[in-house]
Curated annotation (Swiss-Prot):
Residues 95-122 are annotated as: Disordered. GO terms for biological process: translation. One of its GO terms (molecular function) is structural constituent of ribosome. It holds the Pfam family Ribosomal_S13. Keywords: Ribonucleoprotein, Ribosomal protein, RNA-binding, rRNA-binding, tRNA-binding. Part of the 30S ribosomal subunit. Forms a loose heterodimer with protein S19. Forms two bridges to the 50S subunit in the 70S ribosome. This is Small ribosomal subunit protein uS13. The gene is rpsM.
Amino acid sequence: MARIAGIDLPRNKRIEIALTYIYGIGRSTAQKILADAGVDSNTRSDNLTESEIARIRENIDKNVKVEGDLRRDISMNIKRLMDLGCYRGLRHRKGLPVHGQRTKTNARTRKGPARTVAGKKK
């Protein structure tokens, strides 16, 4: 079983799909990584040679920010917005949608479960 960026890749999947199990790598990034490493994207992950795994691992370490580093960067960017006190930071701080979505109805994912108000009717 190949272990790349601290993640055990699933055994019997195409390597292009298996790489998407790593946080920060989607289909298009996986295709670019495999093209740069010179590995066929239809190869199953359990059929990879050690040299192919090493080339993929080296390519990811050099060119792509994944897992812990990416999570840390995202949380630091959000923290920076909150410290600045800009509109987006305030929305993050209040737990409301950040990108201009409506909040009179919907937005339940971001706002959490509905809290009913006593005595409020149409």
